[in-house]
Amino acid sequence: MYLETRRAIFVFWIFLQVQGTKDISINIYHSETKDIDNPPRNETTESTEKMYKMSTMRRIFDLAKHRTKRSAFFPTGVKVCPQESMKQILDSLQAYYRLRVCQEAVWEAYRIFLDRIPDTGEYQDWVSICQQETFCLFDIGKNFSNSQEHLDLLQQRIKQRSFPDRKDEISAEKTLGEPGETIVISTDVANVSLGPFPLTPDDTLLNEILDNTLNDTKMPTTERETEFAVLEEQRVELSVSLVNQKFKAELADSQSPYYQELAGKSQLQMQKIFKKLPGFKKIHVLGFRPKKEKDGSSSTEMQLTAIFKRHSAEAKSPASDLLSFDSNKIESEEVYHGTMEEDKQPEIYLTATDLKRLISKALEEEQSLDVGTIQFTDEIAGSLPAFGPDTQSELPTSFAVITEDATLSPELPPVEPQLETVDGAEHGLPDTSWSPPAMASTSLSEAPPFFMASSIFSLTDQGTTDTMATDQTMLVPGLTIPTSDYSAISQLALGISHPPASSDDSRSSAGGEDMVRHLDEMDLSDTPAPSEVPELSEYVSVPDHFLEDTTPVSALQYITTSSMTIAPKGRELVVFFSLRVANMAFSNDLFNKSSLEYRALEQQFTQLLVPYLRSNLTGFKQLEILNFRNGSVIVNSKMKFAKSVPYNLTKAVHGVLEDFRSAAAQQLHLEIDSYSLNIEPADQADPCKFLACGEFAQCVKNERTEEAECRCKPGYDSQGSLDGLEPGLCGPGTKECEVLQGKGAPCRLPDHSENQAYKTSVKKFQNQQNNKVISKRNSELLTVEYEEFNHQDWEGN
C-alpha cells in the first residue's frame, strides 16, 4: 500500500511537469503572434486567461525565486540589509565604530581621571557629544583632566603624603588660569608612596599628566638629598618554624659549622623573599631553638630580624588612600643626579602592621620553604644609628639560650621603653662578649618586666672589647608578684643568674631546668598543704558583712613563658573554661546537681572531654564540671594539671578546645559556639564567674581546700545549685532546696521530720568516719603486736 501511494504521487508530479511545459509553449506562441493577429485592446483579456491556465505548483516555484534574502550580520554586530547599497553599509559600520569608540573613551575618562563610575545620564550625554564630533577624543581627555573634580581629587591624594617643604604644590588658580596652558607638575609626583604592596617597574601613574612634563621638569639633586636626608630604620622580629628541619645539638652553638651552614642558607633564602618587599635593607638570623609541634613531632624554630627603611614622619597606613587604577599602567621614574632611571622602583614606607601582613603573605606563598608557623615578637621601631657595611651574616647570640615570647601578666604591664639592639660587629665586640646587662636589685616594680633576645646588649664603651657586666641576672618572664608576698620570693626572682657569655653553651642551655628545679626545692607559699582527713565543716566562718562581693584572689601568679608554665610550690596548675552548646536545649533539672539529667549530661561531657584532653595536653590530671547554665547550655568547667607543664598553658588549652569544637561539630553534631570559648588560668581568673553561685549565695574561699566555693547567705542552704532563687520563699533555718518547674531551685522551709532526717544522716556519716578511723587504728595495733610476737619467738628459738 505504501509503495502504491508513492507511485501515485510520482505520476501526479510528472503530470504537473508536463502540463506546465505545455503552458509555457502556448505562452511563447501567443506572445509572438499577438501583435499581428490581435488588436491592443484585447491584450489584457488574453493575459488574464493565460494566468488562469498556469498551474498552482508553477506559481509557487515562481514566488520562491523572488523571495527576499535574510539579513547578514558582521562579526561586530552591525546588521546589513540586502536592500542597502554599499554606501549605506559603510555608513552603518562607521556609525557603529564611532559609538563603540565614544563609549570606551568616556568610560575610561571617568575611571582614570575621576576614579568613579558615571551616572547613566551624564554618561549618555558625553557619548552623544562624542558621536556628534563636538570634541575629538583627546579633547575629551583634556576636559576631564582640567575639571575641578579631578584637580581636587589629585590635590587630596598628593597632600596625603608627608613631604617636608614641598615646592611643587599645585594651586587651583594657576591650573585653571589659561585654557591652553599645559599643566606642570614636578616629577617627584611619580615617587609618591602608593600603597602597601611593591610596585613593579612596568606600572605607570597619571600617564596623561606626567607624559609631557617628565622630560622638561627635573628636580635638583640637592633638593632630593635634603628632602630624604633624615631616614629611620624599622626593625621587625619574627620566629619561623621549619617543619622538616629537626633540631640538633650543634644548633645551640653559634660557632659550630652546622649552625653557620644552616644560618647562611636560611639567610640567603630569606633575602630572596624579603627583597620583594618595599624598603627592605637586610636580615639577620638570630638563632635556632627546638620546637614541639601539636602532633608530637619536633622541629626547629628560627628567629629573624629584618630591617626596613621608613620615612621620619611616617604617615598612617596608605592602604585606604589609593586610587584604584586597575589595569592602567603606572610609570615610575627616579630623578638621580639629574638623569632619569626608569628601571628603578619608587621607595615605599610602610607601617608595622603593613610590614607584618606583607611578610606573612610572602612567607606563606613561598613554595621552596616548608614554613610551619610565623610569629612576630615586639619590634623596635625607633631610629637606629647609621651603621657601616654589614660585615656579619648573623648576630652572635645563641637563640637557644634566651627565652623569648614571654607572656606578661595583666597586673604588670611594661612601662619602661624597650632597649635598642646594638650590633656588636659595628663596635668591635667579639662574639664572646654578648651578654645581658646587670640588674639593680632594688625593686621588681622598677625593673623592666622581661628581656628578649633583641633587647640584650653588652655594657661596653665604643671601641673596647672588655665587658663591664660580670654579675648578670635575668628576671623570670611573666612573674607577677603582689606587694604582700614580695619578701617571700624577692630573692628568687633576682637569684636566677645568667652565666657569663664566655662560658660553655651547655651550661647556658640548662638555665630553664635549673629554674624549675630551684622552684621545686623552694616553697613559695606559706599556706600549709591541704589535709588528707576529710572534714564536714568545709566553709570558713565569715561574718555576714564580709560575705558581700567576696572574690578570692590567687596569692601567687604562675610563671608563664612560651615554653613552660609553673605553679607555686605545693599547688597545681588550674584552668577555668566555659563553652556554649548552641543546639542543646536547657532544662530546669540542670540547676540541681543531684538530678538524673544533670548527672547524665555531666557524665557525657566528662567522657567526651577527658580522653581528648589527656591525649593532647601533657600533665593533664582532672576535669571537673562546675555547673550548667541557661543560654542554650553553658558548661562551666575546671581543669587541673601537674605543677609544671612544658608549654604555655592558656594557649595550649585554647588550641585543644578549638580542635575539640571542630571534631564535635563533624562527628557528634554538637554545635559549640567558637566565640563562647572562655579560658582563664586560675592566677588570672575570677572563679566566682565560673561558679555562678546565684542570687542568694555568695562566693567565698574555702579554708581547707583554698578554693572558691558557693556559700548560702544566712537563712539559705542548698543540696545542689541556688541559681534562680525567688525571694520570700526562704527564711531563717532553711536547710534544703527543691526544684520547681520553670522557677529554678527556690528554697523552702523544711518541716520537723525532714530536719530530723537531715540531722540523722549527718550523725550517721560521722559514725561511719569514726568507725573507719577506729578499725584502721586497731588493724595497725594488731600488726605491730604480731610483728613483736614473731620477733620474740625467733629470738627464743
UniProtKB/Swiss-Prot annotation:
Gene Ontology MF terms in the entry: chondroitin sulfate binding; extracellular matrix structural constituent; heparin binding; hyaluronic acid binding
The signal sequence is 1-20
Give tissue specificity per the record: Expressed in the retina (at protein level). In the retina, specifically expressed by cone and rod photoreceptor cells. Localizes to cone and rod photoreceptor cells surrounding the interphotoreceptor matrix of the retina.
The entry's function note states: Chondroitin sulfate-, heparin- and hyaluronan-binding protein. May serve to form a basic macromolecular scaffold comprising the insoluble interphotoreceptor matrix.
Could you say which disease the record links this protein to?
A: Macular dystrophy, vitelliform, 4: A form of macular dystrophy, a retinal disease in which various forms of deposits, pigmentary changes, and atrophic lesions are observed in the macula lutea. Vitelliform macular dystrophies are characterized by yellow, lipofuscin-containing deposits, usually localized at the center of the macula. VMD4 features include late-onset moderate visual impairment, small satellite drusen-like lesions in the foveal area, and preservation of retinal pigment epithelium reflectivity. Retinitis pigmentosa 91: A form of retinitis pigmentosa, a retinal dystrophy belonging to the group of pigmentary retinopathies. Retinitis pigmentosa is characterized by retinal pigment deposits visible on fundus examination and primary loss of rod photoreceptor cells followed by secondary loss of cone photoreceptors. Patients typically have night vision blindness and loss of midperipheral visual field. RP91 is an autosomal dominant form with bone-spicule pigmentation, attenuation of retinal vessels, and optic disk pallor on funduscopy.
SEA domain segment(s): 232-354, 571-684
Report if keyword tRNA-binding is assigned: no
Q: What is this protein called?
A: Interphotoreceptor matrix proteoglycan 1
Q: Which UniProt keywords apply?
A: Cell projection, Disease variant, Extracellular matrix, Glycoprotein, Heparin-binding, Hyaluronic acid, Receptor, Repeat, Retinitis pigmentosa, Secreted, Sialic acid, Signal
Record-linked Pfam families: SEA
- Outcome of swapping residue 238 to P: Found in a patient with vitelliform macular dystrophy; uncertain significance
PTM description: The N-terminus is blocked.
TM stretches of this protein:
none
Gene field: IMPG1
* Annotated SUPFAM superfamilies: SEA domain
Q: Name one GO cellular component term.
A: extracellular region
Originating species? Homo sapiens (Human)
Where is the protein situated, by its record's location annotation? Answer: Cell projection, Cilium, Photoreceptor outer segment; Secreted, Extracellular space, Extracellular matrix, Interphotoreceptor matrix; Photoreceptor inner segment
Q: Which residues are glycosylated?
A: 42, 143, 191, 215, 403, 421, 432, 442, 592, 616, 630, 648
The family database entries (InterPro entries) matched by this protein are listed as: EGF-like_dom (IPR000742), IMPG (IPR039861), SEA_dom (IPR000082), SEA_dom_sf (IPR036364)
Any one biological process term the GO annotation gives: visual perception
Where would I look for the motif Heparin- and hyaluronan-binding in this sequence? Answer: 621-629
